[in-house]
């Protein structure tokens, strides 16, 4: 049984544009936002994917003209995956645990679920299985961290083509160099590459507001160092349309079914 969901890219040859070379089905599914490549391989292996009506096989290649269908089991598995919003405290790492430091996912327990969570999702230990951070937040930073089982959300937030905004409040010390604020907005480079334009404004005499559309390692701290400032506190308060809001530090809640980044 298949769903009435058809995923197909435009027929480029109809516009006089040469067809692209065939690529792996799993890559095409990720490009279309159906799921992550790892999830695609799992669905294909289970026989949950059809190409032009025929059950797909691992390693199969497709073109933009091919029709891709997911069956009911794949759709149900996606629907059961959860995304969790955590207000990460200092001292926890976003990803795998490191020496002397705990992983943020260890905070996802029934006891730490925020009593203001209105999602009506009952916590189950399986919700921590394959739960991965969709983006980093430094060990010495606090605020909104997204942990998800859904590869589509991870791709949206941290994929190569991600354009999701991330908003931060940043406390600083030091003396801002001449033209420093303008450089923070546009004109700095890290790791030999120009940074995308940002939105950086003063909130008060020692706090800046950053809105970024990329996430290089320790990006804000390194940007500030380039203009004579030292970051003494960093808090992420928004990712896309999802705000940290009143979520207490160390607590978490589920992303609601109608929640969209």
Predicted regions and their residues:
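Basic, flexible Lys/Arg- and Gly-enriched helix-loop patches that mediate nucleic-acid binding at interfaces
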Residues: 19-261
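Short, Lys/Arg-enriched N-terminal segments with co-localized hydrophobic residues
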Residues: 5-18
């Amino acid at each position: 049984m298949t769903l009435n969901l058809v995923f197909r890219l435009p027929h480029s040859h109809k516009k006089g544009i040469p067809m692209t070379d065939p690529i792996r089905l799993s890559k095409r599914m990720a490009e279309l936002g159906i799921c992550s490549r790892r999830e695609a391989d799992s669905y294909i292996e289970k026989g949950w994917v059809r190409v032009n009506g025929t059950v797909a096989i691992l390693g199969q290649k497709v073109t933009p003209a091919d029709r891709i269908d997911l069956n009911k089991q794949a759709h149900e598995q996606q629907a059961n995956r959860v995304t969790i919003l955590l207000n990460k405290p200092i001292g926890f790492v976003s990803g795998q645990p490191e020496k002397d430091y705990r992983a943020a996912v260890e905070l996802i327990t029934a006891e730490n679920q925020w009593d203001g969570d209105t999602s009506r999702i009952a916590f189950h230990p399986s919700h921590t299985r394959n739960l991965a951070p969709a983006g980093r937040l430094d060990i010495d930073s606090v605020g909104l961290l997204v942990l998800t089982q859904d590869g589509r959300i991870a791709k949206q937030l941290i994929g190569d083509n991600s354009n999701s905004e991330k908003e931060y409040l940043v406390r600083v010390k030091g003396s801002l160099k001449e033209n420093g604020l303008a450089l923070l907005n546009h004109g700095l480079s890290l790791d030999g590459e120009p940074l995308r334009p940002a939105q950086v404004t003063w909130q008060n005499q020692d706090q800046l507001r950053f809105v970024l559309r990329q996430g290089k390692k320790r990006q804000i701290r390194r940007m500030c160092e380039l203009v004579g400032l030292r970051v003494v506190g960093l808090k992420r308060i928004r990712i896309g349309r999802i705000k940290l809001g009143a979520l207490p530090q160390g607590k978490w809640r589920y992303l609601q079914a109608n929640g969209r980044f």
